[in-house]
Amino acid sequence: RVVPQGIPYETESWAWLLDPRWHGKVAVVNDPAIGLFDLALAVQAAGWMQFEDIGNMTRQEIDQLFACLLPLKQRGHFRGAWASVPESVEMMCNNEVVIQSMFSPGVAAVNGAGIPCSYAAPREGYRAWHGVMCLSSATTGNTRDAAYEYMNWWLSGWPGAFIARQGYYISNPQRSREHLSPAEWDYWYAGKPARTELTNTFGEVSVSAGSVRSGGSYDQRLSNISVWNTVMNNYEYTLPRWREFLLA
């Protein structure tokens, strides 16, 4: 491992993103609604500044945050910002980065390529998100029926089991449990050591026997959340600042 694994929730930290040991080998997701929170958590964890409400920053806090980040970017601390999961996988597999923002399918793909890659379980807590499907009140007839059928399909069990192999959770996990092997359920949801090798959605081995999911069980991980991804009141104010960061 290039970045030594620490003790979950004790020594692992968002501040690792700013550690000078990884200078030039750090990347973040190119999305101010996501990557901004990763960097804010890192800056706060490093003790450079504190936010009154990190999920809804003031303009003054946003300016102070970028005052911390721009000099780092100008000195080449960040390798770049990725715009897609395949791009993040390529960066990791090509050794362009050793630590970065990543989504679960990317981590599964890197492990599937035979390169050890794991999430940190930061002592400050996770940045969490939840995706939803919304139906317009103006939808009627066959279109509405098809939309409900699609949403019901997502909750039918099989889709939740499929995305579990990428590391994602679903809101009704018990429905998906029957579509997962006991070994898969124990690893992905219960936080137990993998009884056997487990495969990702491409059929590649992404979990070795005996390994434990970073952060532990579903309950343990959901109990350690620092901030939920939201669109802040000052989201639009962050856009030109984020572009300034990318171009620095």
What is each stretch, according to the model?
Residues L135-R213:
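Mature extracytoplasmic/periplasmic domains
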Residues R1-E87:
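Extracytoplasmic ligand-binding site segments that recognize negatively charged/polar headgroups
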Residues V2-Q5, G24, P32-L36, P105-A108, ...:
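Solvent-exposed loop/turn segments at secondary-structure junctions
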Residues W22-K25, C93-I99:
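Alpha-to-beta junction loops
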Residues W14, S88-V89, V107, A147, ...:
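Short, hydrophobic alpha-helical packing/hinge segments within bilobed ligand-binding/sensory domains
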Residues G203-A248:
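Conserved C-terminal helix/tail region of periplasmic/extracytoplasmic solute-binding proteins
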